[in-house]
Curated annotation (Swiss-Prot):
FF domain sequence ranges: 270-327, 368-422, 429-483, 485-550
Upper taxonomic lineage: Eukaryota, Metazoa, Chordata, Craniata, Vertebrata
Key word Transcription present: yes
InterPro entries attached to this UniProt entry: FF_domain (IPR002713), FF_domain_sf (IPR036517), P-loop_NTPase (IPR027417), pG1 (IPR039007), Rho-GAP_domain (IPR051978), Rho_GTPase_activation_prot (IPR008936), RhoGAP-FF1 (IPR032835), RhoGAP_dom (IPR000198)
Protein name, per record: Rho GTPase-activating protein 35
GO molecular function ontology, one term from the record: DNA binding
Modified residues (Phosphoserine): 589, 770, 773, 970, 975, 985, 1002, 1073, 1135, 1143, 1151, 1177, 1180, 1222, 1237, 1473, 1477, 1484
The organism of origin for this protein: Canis lupus familiaris (Dog)
CDD domains in alphabetical order: pseudoGTPaseD_p190RhoGAP-A, RhoGAP_p190
GO cellular component term, pick one: actin cytoskeleton
């Protein structure tokens, strides 16, 4: 377009021609000067549209194409640009070149035959239909590119860009190029058009060439030079804009920027765009598996992406993307590598934890060793392709196993070396710990209680400090101290038991005197076990006081062997063996309308009662209902805070009959209020017929809301409360008691315990009052007490098995869990024997207060404390009561090898000889003895029955004589049996908190014999009348249950017996001032009779004399007098002849016998500490009451000692004398010899008896021992008849366990163990676990699920409970049940059905707590649950459908007996047991667990 049209408003258009060196290779060299690249960059500046290669060698066809169009110039197209002054313009770009024929390598012939210099200077260009040029690829493929023609087919050139290549061109001389350029410039100058020199390829420029080019330009007038680089896109636009400015003089002059400055700006622009683009890529691309195609589509619209692609091109953008992907992949691989390297030490610990195995192996050998391990594939994976980071394994996120080729890397080798070093250090530290512990155990300087500071210098050395911190040694030392202290305490407790005679001789009470404590320390002071606790004197004294409390207040809770107290074991055994009487009387109990109602009095001043009542009501439901053991009870509270004599504060009202009372105090004043209120309440009801408040159950509670358990005031209140509780015979709770919470008076657990105790009291009252019980009790012929020592190394189950499993053994009707009834043939007749099985400490309280016909006393031959307790017990037993001593041994071998056993056996036999008792020994390891061994003893008891009963009745009758006439005549008067509720000696001030011996068993069976004997007495208008009334009361009056001792003290001098004389003379009885029974504290334990022929001088007081026909066929009468029942009505003389005369008057021959004495006087081995008994005043140590002292003073005035003679009044009819019916026969029976037994060795195991979690691992969830046993049984014993039922040899089982404990790789088949031995050892493993395999909390859920009636729902519920098992328990349980299921499939051969197996296994797997009634009644449920697990094993553990039951499953014990071969063969008739109740007696779970040999022994 002509410049003349510039004035047009249209956008100005400029035509620019780019010229420079062109021609053949000879002229220009191997490459051009960059004219095409310059044009390309300016016309299409985007990096993707920029092409570096533009060839000038064309074929004829390409030369003739529409793009070249047979011309030696190229039309690059039209470009719009905004110049510096923001004026837009258009530019048509033409490049003058010279195309070479690709065949002749000569310039193509064209319409213009001029040389290049002249053609390039042409200002008028014409070429019809010539197309715009893009790149070389366009030639021949014009249709694939945009087709845009040169406007009008012609152009008028407005200016020239003269290009000079300043790079080092191949085969080109720069000087020659400069000459060519000079000639071309001269030609261009002739056109008068603007010219701008463009230096191309400055990015590769040579400094001299650039300088020469500038020199050339300076030599020309106004010739401007622009340094450019088309490849780097530097100053390209500047060159064209400079030319446009020269063309259009009106435009401002363009500033020419040097190349390096422009390059810096361009580089900064590219760097900024690159940063933005990389940020965009990092934000979008997170996974190294992303591909460019999908990511570029996501970035297409992003300006960061567009700017960078414009500047650098798509390829560079892709390259950056690939670099980012590579970086992500590298980071991913490194993360995986770190995970693998972190897991590698764990793999080493799991696969090669034994240092001895790898200590001397190289890394290569270790790799081979790892591959041989069974769990190798659990930790490692061997890849087919290596290395692992170049395979797809890096993307396998689910597989966390370590690639095995990682072991070849340096970090893995370093970790292996670190593992080796760690094992070596651990071994050394373990050696140091072991050496330190051995040092502790062997050092004589380490004693219990020695502080670490004192012990450190004796046991520490430099090696210890080098390997372990001192804190580690202190921890080991602390544990060692705890062990030796616990051991010393146990040994000291055993020492106290070995001196039981001392404690009982001292007659200690709740507050022993300093003198008696001094005696104890003097006696025990030389014992090494006493000295062992010399640094723990406070704890030693506490143990002594605790033992004194046990002696003074013996209960199951205070027993040193608690919770393994014999009483608890006996209750469990008997309750498991029989249905309890309370169950049989349940219907009668339910008939009581008040059975579900509890009336509770809360006594406490200053708001204590109201506050506790509010707390209890807060625990109740909205309608004052309280839940106890799942049953709802109506709770009625009566808080009392004022004077109880007022009707408004009375304990009972016409509508409120209290069942118990909670007494609260927090100060001395409130405690005094409680005592005064209780005494007033009892006094107000004294003498009433409904006098039940005297025996109201009481609980004394110290309220301490602040939770402070220290301080002198609090300790003083506790001591005073304990003393008051002792006097009131009630339970005491102090702030330190379990269950008392901070800020509260009492918590829900404690409330439940109190209410349960009240319910038990109500039930016992109803039970004792039942008519059936009285009838049964009256039919008992003999009452025998069997005494066992708590803590003896024998099983009560084995000792009592012949008794409880005997066919003649029945449940006692007294409601006691400590007694049974036996019907045994003794002599010519069967006798009903009530056998009470008690601990020694429970038996002490009944020696003088209960009627007992004989004692069977057991002791362990290898335990000193056992024989010591026996000696202490026998000291206070009357010598008329037969004694059977039973020594328990470990067998003949043990007796021969053990000096202690021999000595104790010998001593027991000597004691038996000296007291005319019987002696036998029983081997504990072979408890196959029968009741026949006691028959000689029972015969002795029958022979001495009359004198025992008469002596006991005389003691009660003598006390009964002090009551008023109203007592004997009133049908509602208290029975003399009530005296048995009170203790006879000071050591029994506080009775046990649980009833061990029935109060109604003292005398009722005497009536049959004594009513007959009393008819033989002549002229029995005196004492005989009283006796007949007394016996009548025994037959008709039912005694109440155990009642607390009344707080009122009595003086024996009030018991005036002179009314006996008045009754004979005046025909009437004189009432006594006291209308209450004499308490046992009112007479001396030596109130027995002695022979009349011992009286040799006149008596100044009358004595009680009574006689009983010795033998009616021989006419013998034994006359015995009491030396201590003094009369108050004058004195007289008497002689032996008078006694003989009175006897001869009845025509009877008199035989004289001695007074009953205690066994301590007959045996030299008993009462070795008797001297201490007389060293101190009889009675309470620090609280000796004035009444007791007065009694002693009065007693000492008339006579002293057992042999003192009391004057006897001679006048009056001898028929008024008191008569004792007694018969004394002394016989000696042959003593059975003990049978030998096998000694059981013991060892400490690190495998058996430890928690299950210690013998399993996540990799090996089944204990190795169980796995070996089951594999052996399934391989050899599935066809064994009675597998798991027939017991293996005990010694072999122990040998198996011991050998396995030493070598876990033990081969059972090689050792030739029997199947039954292996089976028994496997069951023993589960029995010895600290917790049962089926956890206790899961057992509750299982029982609840079992209650569901629908079978399918029940099984699904059980399966849900099974999922809650701890993982270790679940895996082992699944393994065992699956094995039992397999065993049951062979039941046709082995006779072990799923039911039989469940009977054998449920106690082993569940081990329920039989101390609760719920557990006892659920035993059948437990067995059924295990049976279901075995039957439905595929359903429970292997996701199989529920299988149908195999035929009719026995639902009753009788059915069980028909299918289980090892149950008793005795015919049994029983009804199916109701749900949640124990099975009938013959098929109780305990019986099923006992050896079959013993169960067959029912017939005696």
């Amino acid at each position: 377009m002509m410049m003349a049209r510039k004035q047009d408003v249209r956008i100005p258009t400029y035509n620019i021609s780019v010229v420079g060196l062109s021609g053949t290779e000879k002229e220009k060299g191997q490459c051009g000067i960059g004219k095409s690249c310059l044009c390309n960059r300016f016309v299409r500046p985007s990096a993707d549209e920029f092409h570096l290669d533009h060839t000038s060698v064309l074929s004829t066809s390409d030369f003739g194409g529409r793009v070249v169009n047979n011309d030696h110039f190229l039309y690059w197209g039209e470009v719009s640009r905004s110049l510096e002054d923001c004026v837009e313009c258009k530019m048509h770009i033409v490049e003058q070149t010279e195309f070479i024929d690709d065949q002749t390598f000569q310039p193509h012939r064209s319409t213009a035959l001029q040389p290049y210099i002249k053609r390039a200077a042409a200002t008028k260009l014409a070429s019809a239909e010539k197309l715009m040029y893009f790149c070389t690829d366009q030639l021949g493929l014009e249709q694939d590119f945009e087709q845009k023609q040169m406007p009008d087919g012609k152009l008028l050139i407005d200016g020239f860009l003269l290009g000079i290549d300043v790079s080092r061109g191949m085969n080109r001389n720069f000087d020659d190029q400069l000459k060519f350029v000079s000639n071309l410039y001269n030609q261009l100058a002739k056109t008068k058009k603007p010219i701008v020199v463009v230096l191309t390829k400055c990015d590769e420029g040579v400094e001299r060439y650039i300088r020469d080019a500038h020199t050339f330009a300076l030599s020309k007038k106004n010739l401007q030079v622009v340094e450019t680089s088309a490849r780097s896109n530097v100053n390209v636009d500047l060159a064209f804009s400079t030319l446009v400015q020269l063309i259009d003089k009106s435009r401002g002059k363009t500033k020419i920027i040097p190349y390096f400055e422009a390059l810096k700006q361009q580089s900064q622009q590219i760097a900024t765009a690159k940063d933005k683009y990389e940020w965009l890529v990092s934000r979008i691309v997170k996974n190294h598996n992303e591909n460019w195609l999908s990511v570029s589509r996501k970035m297409q619209a992003s300006p960061e992406y567009q700017d960078y692609v414009y500047l650098e091109g798509t390829q560079k953008a892709k390259k950056l993307f690939l670099q980012h992907i590579h970086r992500l992949k590298h980071e991913h691989i490194e993360r995986r590598r770190k995970l693998y390297l972190a897991a590698l030490p764990l793999a080493f610990e799991a696969l090669i934890p034994n240092l001895d195995e790898i200590d001397h192996l190289s890394c290569i050998k270790t790799k081979k060793l790892l591959e041989t391990k069974p769990e190798f594939l659990k930790w490692f994976v061997v890849l087919e392709e290596t290395p692992w980071d170049a395979t797809s394994h890096i993307d396998n996120m689910e597989n966390e196993r370590i690639p095995f080729d990682l072991m070849d890397t340096v970090p893995a080798e370093q970790l292996y070396e670190a593992h080796l070093e760690k094992l070596r250090n651990e071994r050394k530290r373990a050696e140091m710990r072991r050496a330190f512990k051995e040092n502790l155990e062997t050092s004589p300087f380490i004693t219990p209680g020695k502080p670490w500071e004192e012990a450190r210098s004796f046991i520490m050395n430099e090696d210890f400090y080098q390997w372990l911190e001192e804190s580690v040694y202190m921890d080991i030392y602390g544990k060692h101290q705890k062990q030796i202290i616990d051991k010393a305490k146990e040994e000291f407790q055993e020492l106290l038991l070995e001196y039981s005679e001392l404690f009982y001789e001292l007659e200690l009470d709740a507050k022993p005197s300093k003198e008696k404590m001094g005696v104890i320390q003097d006696v025990l002071g030389e014992e090494q076990r006493f000295k062992a606790l010399q640094k723990l004197q406070a704890e030693r004294d506490a143990l002594i006081l605790k033992h004194i409390h046990f002696v003074y207040h013996p209960t199951k809770e205070t027993c040193p062997s608690c919770p393994a107290c014999v009483d608890a074991k006996i209750e469990h055994l008997i309750s498991s063996r029989f249905i309890r009487p309370s169950d049989r009387n349940q219907k009668n109990s339910l008939s009581d309308p008040n059975i579900d109602r509890i009336n509770l009095v809360i006594l406490g001043k200053d708001g204590l009662a109201r506050e506790l009542a509010n707390e209890i009501r807060a625990l109740c439901t909205n309608d004052d209902k309280y839940v106890i053991d799942g049953k709802m009870y109506e709770l009625s509270l009566r808080p009392i805070e004022g004077n109880v004599r007022l009707p408004v504060n009375s304990f009972q009202t016409p509508t409120f009959q209290p069942h118990g009372c909670l007494c609260l105090y927090n100060s001395k004043e409130s405690l005094s209020y409680v005592v005064e209120s209780i005494e007033k309440s009892r006094e107000s009801t004294l003498g009433r017929r409904d006098n039940h408040l005297v025996h109201l159950p009481l609980t004394l509670i110290l309220v301490n809301k602040r939770g402070d358990t220290s301080g002198e005031t609090l300790h003083s209140l506790i001591q005073q409360g304990q003393q008051i509780a002792s006097k009131l015979q009630c339970v005491f709770l102090d702030p330190a008691s379990a269950g008392i919470g901070y800020g509260r008076n009492i918590n829900e657990k404690q409330i439940s315990q109190v209410l349960k105790g009240l319910l038990d009291s109500k039930r016992n009252l109803n039970l004792v009052s039942s008519t059936a019980s009285i009838k049964d009790l009256a039919d008992v012929d003999l009452r025998i007490v069997m005494c066992l020592m708590c803590g003896d190394p024998f099983s009560a189950d084995d000792i009592l098995f012949p008794v409880l499993q005997s066919q003649t053994c029945k449940s006692s009707h007294c409601g006691s869990n400590n007694s049974v009834l036996l019907e045994l043939p003794i002599g010519l007749h069967k006798k009903r024997i009530e056998l009470s099985i008690l601990s020694y400490h429970s038996s002490f309280s009944i020696r003088k207060s209960r009627l007992v016909h004989g004692y069977i006393v057991f002791y362990s031959a290898k335990r000193k404390a056992s024989l010591a307790m026996l000696r202490a017990f026998l000291c206070e037993v009357q010598d008329i009561i037969p004694i059977q001593l039973v020594a328990l041994t470990d067998g003949a071998i043990d007796v021969l090898d053990n000096d202690l056993s021999r000595e104790q056996l010998s001593e027991g036999e000597e004691i038996a000889q000296e007291i005319d008792g019987r002696f036998t020994s029983i081997p504990c390891s072979q408890p196959q003895h029968k009741l026949e061994i006691f028959h000689p003893f029972f015969k002795d008891v029958v022979d001495k029955k009359n004198i025992i009963e008469a002596t006991h009745m005389y003691d009660n009758a003598a006390e009964a004589c002090s009551t008023t006439e109203e007592v004997f005549n009133s049908p509602r008067a208290g029975s003399p049996l009530c005296n048995s509720n009170l203790q006879d000696s000071e050591e029994d001030i506080e009775p046990p908190s649980y009833s061990l011996f029935r109060e109604d068993t003292s005398l009722p069976s005497l009536s049959k014999d004594h009513s007959k004997l009393s008819m033989e007495l002549e002229g029995n208008d005196g004492l005989s009348f009283i006796m007949s009334n007394f016996e009548s009361k025994l037959n008709n009056k039912v005694p109440p249950p155990v009642k607390p001792k009344p707080p009122v003290q009595f003086d024996i001098t009030k018991g005036d017996l002179s009314y006996l004389d008045q009754g004979h003379r005046d025909g009437q009885r004189k009432s006594v001032s006291s209308s209450t029974w004499l308490p046992p504290d009112g007479f001396d334990p030596s109130d027995y009779a002695e022979p009349m022929d011992a009286v040799v001088k006149p008596r100044n007081e009358e004595e009680n004399i009574y006689s009983v026909p010795h033998d009616s066929t021989q006419g013998k009468i034994i006359t015995i007098r009491n030396i201590n029942k003094a009369q108050s009505n004058g004195s007289g003389n008497g002689s032996d002849s008078e006694m003989d005369t009175s006897s001869l008057e009845r025509g009877r021959k008199v035989s004289i016998v001695s007074k009953p004495v205690l066994y301590r006087t007959r045996c030299s081995r008993l009462g070795r500490f008797a001297s201490y008994r007389t060293s101190f005043s009889v009675g309470s140590d620090d609280e000796l009451g004035p009444i007791r002292k007065k009694e002693e003073d009065q007693a000492s005035q008339g006579y002293k000692g057992d042999n003192a003679v009391i004057p006897y009044e001679t006048d009056e009819d001898p028929r008024r004398r008191n008569i004792l019916r007694s018969l004394r026969r002394n016989t000696k029976k042959p003593k059975p010899k003990p049978r030998p037994s096998i000694t059981k060795a013991t060892w400490e195991s690190n495998y058996f008896g430890v928690p299950l979690t210690t013998v399993v691992t996540p990799e090996k969830p089944i204990p190795v021992f169980i796995e070996r046993c089951i594999e052996y049984i399934e391989a050899t014993g599935l066809s064994t008849e009675g597998i798991y039922r027939v017991s293996g040899n005990k010694s072999e089982m122990e040998s198996l366990q011991r050998q396995f404990d030493q070598d876990h790789n033990l081969d059972l088949a090689e050792k030739d163990f029997t199947v039954n031995t292996v089976a028994g050892a496997m069951k023993s493993f589960f029995s010895e676990l600290p917790d049962p395999l089926v956890p206790y909390n899961m057992q509750i859920d299982l029982v609840e699920a079992h209650k569901i009636n629908d079978r399918e729902q029940k099984l699904h519920a059980l399966k849900e409970v099974l999922k809650k098992f701890p993982k270790e328990n679940h895996e082992v349980f699944k393994y065992v049940i699956s094995h039992l299921n397999k065993v049951s499939h062979n039941n046709k051969v082995n006779l072990m059905t799923s039911e039989n197996l469940s009977i054998c296994f449920w106690p082993t797997l569940m081990r329920p707590d039989f101390s609760t009634m719920d557990a006892l009644t659920a035993t059948r449920t437990y067995q059924t649950i295990i049976e279901l697990f075995i039957q439905q094993c595929p359903f429970f553990f292997h996701n199989r459908p529920i299988s149908e039951p195999p035929g009719a499953t026995p639902s009753s014990p009788s059915a069980v007996a028909s299918t289980v071969p090892f149950l008793t063969s005795t015919p049994v008739t029983s009804q199916p047991s109701p749900p949640q109740s124990p099975p009938p007696t013959p098929q109780s779970p305990m019986q099923a667990l006992l050896p079959s040999q013993l169960q067959a022994e029912h017939t005696l």
